[in-house]
Amino acid sequence: MKFLRVDHIDIVCADLKKSLEFYRKFGMHPEGTIDGGKTVFLFNGDEDRPVRIELHQAKPGDKTGIDHISFGVDDPVDATKEIKYLGGVKFAFEPFENQQSGRTISNSHDPDGVLVQMCRKTAAGTYKNWE
């Protein structure tokens, strides 16, 4: 198993509007929203060298900053089994199909506590029905 690419970076924002304005200056464009506009998916528009960021409005008490880094893999289910076999990694939950994103995902934490997600696009996803 190996990481194929960085799929996206998820950021929890103190002020979603300010963060959206900031990333737009770097050529990021909204692909859509979910959660009543409290989550915005950004894309650089380059399919050959894609950059994707998910911005989430922080809720009271939430820590702001990077929530997780998501890496694309061939198969998150097989990758999770392989890593469990090797030992030493605890997973936050078993792989599952996220209906909104159309991705199969699995989450674990690295030794420093960073949430690391493995994912694979498996369906269209309902978040394409932008709010």
Identify the residue ranges that each predicted region occupies.
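Short polar/acidic secondary-structure junctions
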Residues: 45-47, 60-61, 97-98
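Conserved beta-strand in the GNAT
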Residues: 53-56, 116-117
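Core segments of cupin and vicinal oxygen chelate
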Residues: 3, 10-51
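Short amphipathic alpha-helices in soluble, non-transmembrane regions
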Residues: 22-26, 82-87
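Vicinal oxygen chelate
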Residues: 6-14, 33, 43, 60-131, ...
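N-terminal beta-strand motif that seeds the catalytic metal site of vicinal oxygen chelate
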Residues: 1-17, 66-69, 119-131
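A contiguous binding-surface segment within folded domains or other stable secondary-structure elements
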Residues: 48-54, 64-68
